[in-house]
């Protein structure tokens, strides 16, 4: 049977994109609370617009520690400064910061605290469905379209921060279209990069800056025809960031996950402590799907879980290997249940999610990253692959 030929596209946005500015500020607040109390409950949203940042949400600490509004506001400024915003319309030092963060609802608290609520175990912070995914089309076990989209913007950000190309400003987006034969990418059909720049920089100058970065990211010989290499297709892009578009936490959930190659349960990650299963269970299902693929049990794997607020264990676990499985999906699902405690406490303990590790997740994707010495991206480890393989086989 001939392999199905098709195109697929994913996009990414840079750290300076207004929605990513908001995500990074929200996660800086999460890290601030967890650094003082690892059991903190945090749900903080950020809005950023022309020289203004607004913080709102609900928080609670359990060990008597206090995070002041001034500390939260300073964390927001530090994020904007690190990104590099020093423009008239959005400047880390000049922007106003409004803080409307207040205490967590007692009714929510009783559902997520051990020993309280109808069920005495620590329950999920909300109901919902979460998905994890992995594919062997890249070493990261991620969709190639998204990997390349992220890497293009990461390299451009490194170039901007180095000072070697002062014409680049923080806001940027990328998009990569690949040609697939069956499940394998075989070439690039189009690349789009929209990058904010200083006034007076021509489109051709910008193309000459961006072209070598794109070429370095893509496999050799995959650079698209010039007419399919789009740089700032509307012309100039001087007004950008929160001065050009209002940014909000949680609006880039497909960029954050699998670039459209897998389902999404709808819940955003940034601004949430790990008692929120929107975040922690999505990390756990990625960890499990990645380990299933790393174990050679499938070349593609999607996992869905569901939760009820206040209930510890997931209501359902679904494993789909998309016809690539080397074992029955029911056996794989059974092994997952045996090897990994998918309660909020079990996830948090296994993946060490109570640490202040969330800042780096808020730009360039939560998945496909390298686990760090500081405990970041623990869900990207493949240390469960051997046990999974043994149990399934």
Swiss-Prot record:
Record's keyword terms, sorted: ATP-binding, Cytoplasm, Magnesium, Metal-binding, Nucleotide-binding, One-carbon metabolism, Potassium, Transferase
Cellular component GO terms held in the UniProt record: cytoplasm
Molecular function terms from GO: ATP binding; magnesium ion binding; methionine adenosyltransferase activity
Residues reported in the UniProt entry to bind ATP: 17, 171-173, 245, 251-252, 268, 272
InterPro entries noted in UniProt: ADOMET_SYNTHASE_CS (IPR022631), S-AdoMet_synt_C (IPR022630), S-AdoMet_synt_central (IPR022629), S-AdoMet_synt_N (IPR022628), S-AdoMet_synthetase (IPR002133), S-AdoMet_synthetase_sfam (IPR022636)
GO terms, biological process: one-carbon metabolic process; S-adenosylmethionine biosynthetic process
Catalytic reaction equation(s): L-methionine + ATP + H2O = S-adenosyl-L-methionine + phosphate + diphosphate
Protein name stated in the entry: S-adenosylmethionine synthase
Organism of provenance: Hyphomonas neptunium (strain ATCC 15444)
